[in-house]
Amino acid sequence: MGSRWGIAVLGLFCFVSCLEAITSSPKIQVYSRHPAQIGESNNLNCYVSSFHPPQISIRLLKNGQEMPGVEMSDLSFSNDWTFHRLVHTVFTPSNQDTFECEVVHEGVKKTVKWEPDN
């Protein structure tokens, strides 16, 4: 009986370890809430999805500097156990400024630039 428990515990440990070993790189989408108008206030959104494990850093940048007033949704997960999160702030597009979303996941940094709608 004792060896059965040992095998069951070992099997459970291996199963949990395998779940922790699965990683999925994030997909990043950067977009404005409304079509961009130079000089008019808008919302800048960065939607990060399909990532695992859930530990992640997401920053919105203006000219390479972290933007103030950034808000983020709760971390949520999908049916496949990957996670997603929306990060957003108010911004005013201009011809001189660049806006980006910087994501660091599992030690890998990705930066996606916002492009105005045409």
Swiss-Prot record:
Gene Ontology terms, MF aspect: MHC class II protein complex binding; peptide antigen binding
Annotated signal peptide: 1-21
Chief location: secreted
Localization (cell): Secreted
Annotated disulfide bonds: 46-101
Statement: the UniProt record of this protein carries the keyword Secreted: yes
InterPro entries with a match to the protein in the record: Ig-like_dom, Ig-like_dom_sf, Ig-like_fold, Ig/MHC_CS, Ig_C1-set, MHC/Immunoglobulin
Ig-like C1-type domain segment(s): 26-113
Keyword Calcium listed: no
SUPFAM superfamilies assigned to the protein according to its UniProt record, in alphabetical order: Immunoglobulin (SSF48726)
Record field: transmembrane: none
GO CC term (a single one): extracellular region
GO BP: antigen processing and presentation of exogenous peptide antigen via MHC class II; antigen processing and presentation of peptide antigen via MHC class I; peptide antigen assembly with MHC class II protein complex; positive regulation of immune response; positive regulation of T cell activation
Key words of the record: Disulfide bond, Immunity, Immunoglobulin domain, MHC I, Secreted, Signal
Assembly: Heterodimer of an alpha chain and a beta chain. Beta-2-microglobulin is the beta-chain of major histocompatibility complex class I molecules.
Function summary: Component of the class I major histocompatibility complex (MHC). Involved in the presentation of peptide antigens to the immune system.
Family recorded in the similarity comment: Belongs to the beta-2-microglobulin family.
Protein name in the entry: Beta-2-microglobulin
Organism: Ornithorhynchus anatinus
